[in-house]
Amino acid sequence: MNAHTAGGHALRHDWTLSEVQALFALPFNDLLFQAQTIHRAHFDPNEVQVSTLLSIKTGACPEDCKYCPQSARYHTGLETERLMEVEKVLERAREARANGSSRFCMGAAWRNPKERDMPYILRMIEEVRGLGMETCMTLGMLTADQAARLGAAGLDYYNHNLDTSPEFYGEIISTRTYQDRLDTLEHVRGAGMKVCSGGIVGMGEQAKDRAGLLMALANLPRHPESVPINMLVKVKGTPLENEANLDSFEFIRTIAVARIMMPASHVRLSAGREKMNEQMQAMCFMAGANSIFYGCKLLTTPNPDENSDMQLFKRLGIRPAQRAQKPDQIQEEEILAEVSRQNAPDEMFYDATRPRAGVARS
């Protein structure tokens, strides 16, 4: 068996489709009991990691992902925005930290980052880390060199989802291959960063495709440290705007099976949460979800606001996880970040609405 042990449970990388389908087929209570038992062996069951996601460059993406309102191929009414100024990103990061987030995720609607944008991206990473927060980015596909530069700047996590099963993937995206995604994850690992990778359910896939997605994730050489499970957010103007709703229990089953297959990973209750009532969210936490995105938007789609999240946490006895860092270390990093900012050359900060002379921005 291809496995190693963590917390008393074997971390497997050799799942078969029939095994995963058997988990999905368990009676609901049995499935949740198994998932919760495994969850408690690896995590505090009443602690949830809280992240904030900011779109640092919005819209005009050349890809054709059928679920995505940021694709330039679909008319969704989304207002495109250029790459944000570094200081504006830091303002949002400070707000996120004050509201309880321990991780700040930055997303750009690109096929892949351009060289002209890399200095600003690297500066964002360094400055946000200086606030004492974990950093995560999703910028599209990466070369090995780009991944190495992000890692050297201190990026903690890189998000690149597999989206769905290899078999269903071609029904959703044609502008990049499944192997392209796997290659990017390999580059991220090679650069020493942690992997955030999951998928979207409710896109018209079959049950075997949800099983296939989780199998692809769990059979990676190393499990992703973070596994976001997204419910499709149907946006008018995208090809999936009229897709039928996925059964709520099927979504909860997906969370539970992800927890069983990847025991030591954070399973994130991600997009689509705004449409879930409190009871469904509570069942997802029982099934093993222990991470959420926090705030009013997930890139370009709605998300529950901070107050409703904290009220639900209080009712459930859940508390936000804190980054393992001493207060004096955070204070020291803040001072160093402020000194660095004051001494930085002006050209590192720019108005994203006014391209710098001689530089075209996408």
UniProtKB/Swiss-Prot annotation:
Which InterPro entries does the record associate with it?
A: Aldolase_TIM, BATS_dom, Biotin_synth/BioAB, Biotin_synthase, Elp3/MiaA/NifB-like_rSAM, rSAM
Q: Give its E.C. classification number.
A: 2.8.1.6
Q: Which GO molecular function terms does the record list?
A: 2 iron, 2 sulfur cluster binding; 4 iron, 4 sulfur cluster binding; biotin synthase activity; iron ion binding
Query: Which residues of this UniProt protein bind [4Fe-4S] cluster?
Result: C61, C65, C68
Cofactor (UniProt) = [4Fe-4S] cluster; [2Fe-2S] cluster
Q: Domain Radical SAM core: where? A: 46-273
Specify the pathway.
Cofactor biosynthesis; biotin biosynthesis; biotin from 7,8-diaminononanoate: step 2/2
Q: Which GO terms describe its biological process?
A: biotin biosynthetic process
According to the record, cofactor stoichiometry and binding are noted as:
Binds 1 [4Fe-4S] cluster. The cluster is coordinated with 3 cysteines and an exchangeable S-adenosyl-L-methionine. Binds 1 [2Fe-2S] cluster. The cluster is coordinated with 3 cysteines and 1 arginine.
User: Keyword annotations for this protein?
Assistant: 2Fe-2S, 4Fe-4S, Biotin biosynthesis, Iron, Iron-sulfur, Metal-binding, S-adenosyl-L-methionine, Transferase
UniProt enzyme class: transferase
Decide whether keyword Phosphoprotein is in the record.
Answer: no
Report which reactions are catalysed by this protein. (4R,5S)-dethiobiotin + (sulfur carrier)-SH + 2 reduced [2Fe-2S]-[ferredoxin] + 2 S-adenosyl-L-methionine = (sulfur carrier)-H + biotin + 2 5'-deoxyadenosine + 2 L-methionine + 2 oxidized [2Fe-2S]-[ferredoxin]
Q: Name one Pfam family in it.
A: BATS
Q: Where does [2Fe-2S] cluster bind?
A: C105, C136, C196, R268
Q: What NCBIfam families would the database entry show?
A: bioB (TIGR00433)
Sum up the protein's function in the record's words: Catalyzes the conversion of dethiobiotin (DTB) to biotin by the insertion of a sulfur atom into dethiobiotin via a radical-based mechanism.
Instruction: Tell me how this protein assembles.
Output: Homodimer.
Protein name as it appears in the record: Biotin synthase
Lineage, broadest ranks: Bacteria, Pseudomonadati, Pseudomonadota, Gammaproteobacteria, Aeromonadales
